Amino acid sequence: IDFEEIKKDMILLASNYAEGYVRVIISRSTSKSDYDVYIFHQEPVEIPEHYSLQSQPSPWHPGGDFALEDNQVVGTKSTSYALNIAQTRIAEQNGYSDALLLNRENIVLEGPTFSIGWIKGDTVYVPDLQLGILDSITRQYILLFGSNNQIKVKESRISIDEIYDVDTVFVISTAKHAKFVSKIDSKTYNQSPILELIQDCFTKQIEIEKLNEFK
């Protein structure tokens, strides 16, 4: 796969739009040399000002750790986002912005399309990868900010009951650079000043990468 060529095509496509996202899908068949690349523009995602999450069990998730009798989708290998979307829609029907996925032990995993983080005291936490969560780019940036001593970061695990007691919760994705979560289930949160620091770290990182790319 010629990633440099894909990168050039992405930049060319992005130059036609003032805002939005450029998405890339690479599909491969049984042969390593046989693949297709799809590059497309997506309009900016509208994110509600007050962002709320409903906790939901996720037996289909790689980190769900549910038994076969718990749900018929356990053990199903799928590249479909249908199950993610279904949990988002359930949350929306119940008056929430999105879903917060839990495993069998009620440990917080991630969202259907985003990673999760939380703040307690002066420390920022993200779930560890052994839970089967996605090692997302934005999650990697949180760890990078920690290694650069911009913020204090730890990988950890937290139950849904424990996350009710933290100071601040936020979500991270391509469209959500540390978006404040105002409510999980019936628990409401206040925004820690550290969250603004995280958001500032993302803004500066993007500017650095833009400068490096277009030198």
Predicted regions and their residues:
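Helix-start/capping segments and mature chain N-termini
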Residues: I1-L12, K32-K215
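Short, acidic/charged, Gly/Pro-enriched secondary-structure junctions
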Residues: E4-R28
